[in-house]
């Protein structure tokens, strides 16, 4: 075994909030004593924006504004050049999570075109003959709970061929009537999206009913903006020809890291929507879209 470098964060779930202190230890393990040129630790939080393929070309001028946005950056020298004994050495560290000026610690979010990530990177410099060692570890930031009282916003819906937006498809569709409700389109991110759906009537047999959670990411600047919708998850809530008049429960948990409270800044936006998708025989697809507002309380 050579020399191994590891970062251990004190909290098992690695979740922190603005104003708290991130603490842990850097662990150096080696069979023999290790000569080194210093050990440093860097904490960094960045927003990485990326353009989709369909936007590239339209926004060449736009490349300049898509460089990573730095939220927080801090560096400490943990150990000056010297030697570590054989065995295991633990070096404690603490970083206060404070941002400078008017910057905000956005919530950790792993998207397709918007990525908000916080990392710790430990570097051990060594002599020319030995390779430098680096270890990176991600920690998670949750945004502050929203101020004010949370008020749910229930939505009742009726889906028929007449309510669909595409008029050409409308004429080709068999007759159907679906009713239902979502208990709230204002959603607490730690609680499931709930509601119910009832198939009142349908001339064609139903193949499947699905719930599709969609992220809508917008990257923008003075030259224009790119808005892209991509699927996060798809859940089947009914399989086969659903009994008419039967209440089908709608229940969807928001996945951690892939969702965050709805976010709007000058450079980017992260929004969420849910689609109720009904597949009819032989090959008809019916989609009803509901914008969601996610928050943390």
Curated annotation (Swiss-Prot):
Kindly list the places in or outside the cell where this protein is found, as annotated in its UniProt entry.
Answer: Endosome
Can the keyword Phosphoprotein be found in this entry's annotation? no
Tagged with keyword ATP-binding: no
One GO cellular-component annotation of the UniProt record comes to: endosome
Protein known as: Vacuolar protein sorting-associated protein 26C
Tell me, how does this one assemble? Component of the commander complex that is essential for endosomal recycling of transmembrane cargos; the commander complex is composed of the CCC subcomplex and the retriever subcomplex. Component of the heterotrimeric retriever complex consisting of VPS26C, VPS29 and VPS35L; within the complex interacts with VPS35L. Interacts with SNX17 (via C-terminus); the interaction is direct and associates SNX17 with the retriever complex. Interacts with SNX31; the interaction is direct.
Q: What does it do?
A: Component of the commander complex that is essential for endosomal recycling of transmembrane cargos; the commander complex is composed of the CCC subcomplex and the retriever subcomplex. Component of the retriever complex, which is a heterotrimeric complex related to retromer cargo-selective complex (CSC) and essential for retromer-independent retrieval and recycling of numerous cargos such as integrin alpha-5/beta-1 (ITGA5:ITGB1). The recruitment of the retriever complex to the endosomal membrane involves CCC and WASH complexes.
Q: Name one GO biological process term.
A: intracellular protein transport
Q: What are the entry keywords? A: Endosome
**What's this protein's family per the entry?**
Belongs to the VPS26 family.
